[in-house]
Structure formats: C-alpha cells, structure tokens
UniProtKB/Swiss-Prot annotation:
Reaction it catalyzes: [protein]-peptidylproline (omega=180) = [protein]-peptidylproline (omega=0)
Name of the protein in its database record: Trigger factor
PROSITE patterns reported in the protein's UniProt record: FKBP_PPIASE
Gene3D superfamilies membership: 3.10.50.40, Trigger factor ribosome-binding domain, Trigger factor, C-terminal domain
Signal sequence, start to end: none
One Gene Ontology cellular component annotation held by this UniProt entry: cytoplasm
Lineage: Bacteria, Pseudomonadati, Verrucomicrobiota, Opitutia, Opitutales
Family: Belongs to the FKBP-type PPIase family. Tig subfamily.
UniProt remark on domains: Consists of 3 domains; the N-terminus binds the ribosome, the middle domain has PPIase activity, while the C-terminus has intrinsic chaperone activity on its own.
Classification via HAMAP family: Trigger_factor_Tig (MF_00303)
Superkingdom classification of source: Bacteria
Main location group: cytoplasm
Domain PPIase FKBP-type: 161-257
Length: 440
C-alpha cells in the first residue's frame, strides 16, 4: 500500500491510497470466506460449500461488500499512516476496484486546524447586581395582581390600560383590504375584537391600540395605520398606509384585587412581607441566571476574538444549514410566509453563514481547551442532561435513555455538547468579574 497526501488547503487534504493487487485479492477472499461461513446451500453442510459456488450465487452482494471493504481498508490504513485528525469526510472516489488488479482510492477530508491556544484564564466579564430593588419587587407584585384582575364595564371614555371592544374595516387608497389580502380577514374587516388601549404590546394591527384613548361606546373614528416596510405577517400590506373605520362597542377597565388575605392565600403566603421575601428571592435567582448566561457569552466571545485560524469549510456549510433550518422553522411558527424567505434568501444565507462560522470557531477552541484541561463526561453529566431534556420536552427519561443507548451518533453529540458546556463553565470559573450598574 502506498499513500500520497495532497494539501488542498490548510484544513482540506486529499489522500490517494494505492493498494496492490494482492491486497485487493485478499479483501475479496476475505469477503467470500465470510459469505461461505454464513451461507446455507442445499447439498452442502454449513460453511462447506465450495468458494466458486458461493461466489457465483452471491455475486452481486459479494461485489458490493468487496468494494466497500477495499474503500474502508484504504480509508482506515491511509489515515493511520498519515496520522490525520479528520473532522469530516468530504468525498470518496473509489476508482476501479476489481479482482487481480491494483486499486486506487482518493479520499478528500477536512482536518482539525492546528492553532495555539491564547491565554484563557482571567478573561474579563461583567455582571449586573443580582439583588432585587424595592421597585422591582413592587412591579412583580403589581404583575401578580394584574394576572388576577377583573375587567368591568366602564361608563366613561377609554383610558390607558382599558380594553375596548370594537368593530373595524380597513382600506388602502379606498380599496378594501379584504380584496388586497383576502385570506387575512383579521387585517381587513372584523365585526368585534378587543384591543388594549396604549398597551405595552402591539396588537394584531400595529398602532391601533395607541389611538383609542378618549373614545366611548358608540364613537366612530377613522384610524390611520402605517404598516412597517418589513411587515412579514402580511407582505401585501408592508409599507402601506391604511385607514380603519373603527366603532367602539364596549369599554372595560382593569380592576386589580386588593392585597388582602384572599390574595396572599392564592400566592401561598401569609402576608405582604412574606410575599416580598419570596419575590425578592426569585428576582435574585433570575438575575443570577441571567448573569451566568451573559458571562458564558462574554468568555466565549472574548476567547474566539483572541485567536485566528482557518476553519474547515465542511463544518461551516453543515452548521449554516442548521442555523438556516432553525431560523426558518421558528419564523414559520410565528406566521412568516414562505415567500418572505425566498425574497430574503441571500441575506438570510449570509447571516446564517456568519453565525455558523462564529459557532464552529468557538467549538473548535472549546474542544482544544477541554482537551488541555482534561474535561471529561461522567455518568452524572449524562443523568443531568437526561433530566433537563425530560423537563424541557415532556418526554419520559426512560425513552431518552433508550435513545442514547441505541443511537451512538446521538450519544456522541450529547457528550460533545456536555464537554463544550463544561469547558465554558471552566472559563467562567477562572474569569475576572466586574459588577456594573445597568444603564438607565
């Protein structure tokens, strides 16, 4: 066997593995012998049928397995001889593989880039104070009251925070929106719906709720709406000015429950002070989790910015597809139409490729740190992963255990993910921390 190594780039290599005819024939004889041991031929005891009969009866299966065996041998022995750290097999060209003839197999692979790790101990991070302020505690308690609010009919003009029942019909340049976007009735003509007056969150029609204050039952108003240029929910309306003829049918005001015994009981506390202690603790827990997540992002960004190296193209391509698929699925769940993706596919691809490149680079660096620090995956790590996934997906832990024990690829992916997480945790544990007061 002879192995010729060609460097196509810093991370892409081509192996031309040449096998002598004797090596090819040995592989063929090995395959025929295996078929002979397993074959059941009438008139012969198991494993005793002549090789010629076996070769004739199972000719196609033997040929397929023989060619695969030669390619596998070339790949395995070629990598062993060249000591390559292969990340991806890009292409395999087996050439002609036949008995009695030498064979040449060309294997194109992407290899792990060689680079020196930068200093990764003492990376700078900043966090916000984790203690809850009185204002934050009060806002949370007000939110609890809002969740239990009652909405009572108000015999007065609508004010901020009220809910207004109204009917409306929209037109653009005098043409009913029902004709422009016939499959989107909620944007055209609705006999009744509820809108919050000057609410924090936009309703279906952007800006409609901000123009209802001061209206009372029976009032009619032409409301002008400027749809954003990037209004993906209904592309036909993007960048257009619409006029909605609205009529107020009812006004209801939000009435918050008092901070009394019934309210405290519903929150599983005895009094206001106990409630504040509970809320303060939850706010602190949430802030600490946010700080931790932010530190993880900061150390990863800081680390990858300190080192530069060529990134295997196959990893970027694969991760780009993963990023794109995730983005499209998420936005389709939000109602973004397929046509919008087609329209923006160039920008989407470029953005996905940039994100993928950054993600792959950080993983390569983290993998090298994990190796340097001897980060390993233990049984407790796998158990913790199974518990988290069971909680996140609602699956039974037993099902996840079965999946990991039967799917080796999935198990390797989980182990790799855990190693990355533990490497980031290590970086955070060694980072410097500065507490910074939030702006505003």
């Amino acid at each position: 066997m002879n192995v010729q190594l060609n460097s196509l780039s810093d991370t892409r290599k081509s192996l031309v593995v040449s096998l002598e005819a004797s090596e090819v024939d040995a592989a063929h004889q090995e395959v025929v012998a295996e078929f002979a041991r397993q074959a059941r031929i009438p008139g012969f005891r198991p494993g005793k049928a002549p090789a010629a009969i076996i070769a004739k009866r199972f000719a196609k299966d033997i040929t397929d397995e023989f060619k695969q065996r030669v390619v596998t041998k070339a790949y395995r022995d070629g990598l062993e001889k060249q000591k390559l750290d292969v990340l991806t097999v890009v292409n395999v060209e087996p050439g002609e593989v036949a008995q009695g003839k030498p064979a040449s197999v060309t294997i194109t692979v992407d290899v792990r880039p060689d680079f020196k790790l930068p200093d990764y101990v003492g990376l700078p991070t900043s966090v916000a104070p984790s203690e809850a302020t009185e204002d934050e505690v009060d806002r949370v308690i007000e939110g609890m009251r809002a969740e239990r609010a009652e909405f009572k009919v108000a015999e007065r003009p609508a004010a901020k925070g009220d809910y207004v029942k109204l009917a409306y019909e929209g037109k653009i340049d005098g043409k009913p929106i029902a004709e422009i976007a016939p499959d989107k009735q909620i944007y055209s003509k609705v006999p009744q719906t509820w809108e919050e007056v000057e609410g924090a969150n936009e309703g279906v029609i952007p800006g409609l709720g901000k123009q209802l204050a001061g209206l009372k039952v029976g009032d009619k108003k032409d409301v002008e709406i400027d749809f954003p240029a990037d209004f993906a929910a209904v592309p036909e309306l993007a960048g257009k000015k619409a006029v909605y003829a609205a009529e107020v049918l009812e006004v209801r005001e939000r009435v918050l429950p008092p901070l009394d015994e019934a309210f405290f009981k519903a929150q599983h506390v005895g009094n206001l002070e106990t409630l504040k202690v509970s809320v303060r603790s939850e706010i602190k827990r949430r802030k600490e989790a946010q700080n931790r997540a932010e530190q993880r992002r900061q150390v990863t960004d800081a680390l990858t910015a300190k080192v530069d190296f060529p990134i295997p193209e196959s990893l970027i391509e694969s991760e780009t597809q993963t990023v794109l698929r995730s983005f499209i699925e998420e936005n389709m769940r939000r109602g973004v139409p397929q046509e919008q993706f087609e329209k923006d596919k160039k920008e989407l691809f470029e953005g996905a490729r940039q994100a993928a490149t950054k993600r792959v680079k950080s993983r390569l660096v983290l993998a090298k740190i994990a190796e340097a620090e001897k980060v390993e995956v233990n049984e407790q790590d796998i158990d913790a992963f199974i518990y988290r996934e069971a909680m996140r997906t609602g699956q039974k832990p037993d099902k996840l255990v079965k999946m990991l024990t039967t799917d080796r690829e999935q198990l390797r992916a989980v182990q790799q993910s855990i190693i990355f997480d533990k490497a980031i945790d290590f970086l955070v544990s060694k980072a410097t921390v500065t507490t910074v007061q939030p702006k505003g």
